[in-house]
Amino acid sequence: MDSIDLIGIVYFCSMRYRHYPLVILMAIAFQSNAQDKWDLRRCVDYALVNNISIKQTDIQARLAKIQLYQSQLSQYPGASFSTGTSYNSGRNQDPTSFSLITESYLSANMQLQTSAQIFNWYSKRNTIAANQWEFQAAMAASEKVRNDIALNIANVYLLVLLSKEQEKIAGIQLQQSQSQLGNTRKLVNAGSLPELNAAELEAQVARDSATFIMSKGTTAQNVLSLKAFMALDAATPFELDIPPVDKIPVEDIADLQPDAVYASAIANLPQQRVNDYKIKAAERNLAATKANMYPTLSAFGSLGTGYNSRANEILSATPLNAPLGKVTVGGTLYDVYPLRPFTDYTYGKQHLFSQLNQNFRQSIGLSLSVPIFNSGSLRTAYERSKLNIQNLQYQQQADNQKTKQDIYQAYNSAMVALEKFNAGKKSLETADRSYGFAQKRYNVGMLTTLELVTNQNNLFSAKLENALNQYDYVFKMKVLEFYKGKGIKL
């Protein structure tokens, strides 16, 4: 019922009878009860959110997406920073002056490195394309699992509806037997019928009670199976919205010819896309493994600097031009000076940033990597990639054959189910008429109790068989509609 209609009814009742609070509570209770029922759409939607298998396939799709993202990032240059510090004593090489010393000192080094592949025969590009197809395959696989879960839920849902219908038929049968036993017991007590008639009906009531209890157990078991597919807690209250089976829309079987359904399935079913995407991914992986067998050209560069605790720097310099001595020439005394003046230096500890600036170094270059011999690992990877493509192609053929076989089997099963359903309806009509005649004859004493029970059992069996045939036909048709790409609708 629409919310607008419900509000209108509430308003009308409140104005007509002036019991506004009571009407509101009744309306809320009615709406809540309607919402608590589970139809097929609600069951499927709940399963798509909570089913463990679906969650696992979603994780696989997310892992494939992460792998794709990582391969895309591999196109860009890599960079790393490293640093270290050490305390040295004894005879060591000064890392800044590269001279041998015997003093103890503290040193530190820092380096930034980067590298990038310039050309690798499109190995990375093919790897990215392969991961892209793998991601698409994972998404299609997730969709396939969702479709399989929906189909399984529809199957179990129909089984629950069938078991409930059989339970209803068994309950009616039990009520009829109990009513007949009550009437017969009155006639026996009045002396109109022998005790044997009542005993036979008591046995029939016992059999009908057992059948009714078994049908209730079957319904409960099917409900538990449905909850399991939905990942719904077994203790959760659960009431199905039961549509009349004759109101379930079913496409005309003439529009579900197996050849046309198979062509539609190949074009639309996610399993076919999974196979297509995996083959394309394998072809790209083959190209990537082949590229790894050729030389790779790369560029690299680095920046670095260092620090040494014993490094000194000149704080000041004083030129010295003092005479070295005296000399007498021709009786004259002269001062002797050096050809070059001396300089007196004052040293002190070199500061950190001064050292980092002074020791700053750079490098850049190219490298060529040529695979010559690697124990056949690259060739093995290449051959395995080729065989993997063939294996996936065979898997695709096998899946296509199985899909075609399943469709033809479903079509033949639907045809048989339709014929059984039509024949069952005639059998039910005949059994119903026979039971009606038997009741009339029994009421006037022209039929024994055993004969009446036999006719009643025949009618009961015909009802059960008709319900089974009807639900079986509906499910077979829903399978064909599923393969055609119509989804599951009840």
For every predicted segment, state its role.
Residues 33-84, 90, 234, 241-285, ...:
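Bacterial Sec-pathway N-terminal export signals of envelope proteins
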Residues 55-59, 72-73, 104, 118-146, ...:
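Sec/SRP-type N-terminal targeting helices
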Residues 111-113, 157, 262, 365-367, ...:
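Membrane-embedded beta-strand positions in outer-membrane beta-barrel channels/transporters
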Residues 1-40, 48-51, 488-490:
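Bacterial Sec-dependent N-terminal signal peptides
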Residues 59, 73, 210-232, 425-486:
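Short segments within alpha-helical structural elements
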Residues 69, 113, 285-288, 367:
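Outer-membrane beta-barrel architecture
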Residues 82-116, 244-253, 300-370:
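Small/polar, glycine/serine/threonine/aspartate-rich low-complexity segments that form flexible
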Residues 148-264, 413, 417, 458-459, ...:
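Periplasmic alpha-helical coiled-coil/stalk elements that build and connect Gram-negative outer-membrane
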